[in-house]
A protein has these predicted regions:
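Intrinsically disordered or low-complexity boundary/linker segments at protein termini
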Residues: 1-17, 132-146
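Small/aliphatic-rich secondary-structure junction motif
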Residues: 3-48
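Short, solvent-exposed amphipathic alpha-helices that sit
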Residues: 21, 59-71, 94
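General small-molecule cofactor/ligand-binding pocket signal
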Residues: 36, 83-87, 138
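Acidic, proline/glycine-rich short linear motifs
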Residues: 39-66
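Structural beta-alpha unit
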Residues: 73-107, 132, 144-146
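Gly/Ser-rich helix-loop-strand patches that form or flank binding pockets
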Residues: 101-146
């Protein structure tokens, strides 16, 4: 039923809960897993961090790659085929486009991510993916309070 599973991550506790659910689902279906993290670089351009020659965009890409690498290691440890990628741009549209590109059968994501402003029940990225995507979304609730 599920041959290709997309697990977006941002390293948050909610994403970690979703990752565990996604790994369990992939194991049950012997599915291929795609791990993605979106570096939402937005209008930062070549903004430099104080005392650092690294641009804010480069720092975001680096953090995104760390999140991807950590989850790829966990998926590999579960004995599953996995591909990891860092996407750039608005997370909502990038995740939907990538899911279509890889032919995902399901997207497994958390109720919310690292965003500074929390919505009452669900994060804006998750909400957007559910509302505007054509691919089924499994939302894993971490059970923690906002």
């Amino acid at each position: 039923m599920f041959d290709t599973i997309l697990i977006p991550t941002d390293g948050s506790d909610h994403a970690e809960t979703a990752a565990e659910t996604g790994i369990e689902l992939a194991t049950a279906h012997d599915a291929t897993v795609h791990v993605a993290c979106v570096a939402d670089t937005g209008p930062l351009g070549d903004l430099r961090l104080p005392g650092d020659a690294t641009s804010a965009e480069d720092a975001m890409r680096g953090r995104a790659q760390e999140h991807v690498d950590a989850l790829v290691d966990r998926v590999e440890a579960a004995g599953l085929d996995v591909t990891g990628t860092v996407l750039e741009g608005p997370p909502e549209s990038e995740l939907l486009e990538y899911a279509q590109e890889i032919g995902a059968d399901v997207i497994v994501m958390g109720t919310r991510g690292r965003g500074g402003v929390h919505r009452m029940a669900m994060g804006s990225v998750t909400d957007h993916v559910i509302r505007f995507g054509e691919i089924p979304v499994l939302v894993a609730n971490s059970g923690s309070n906002p």
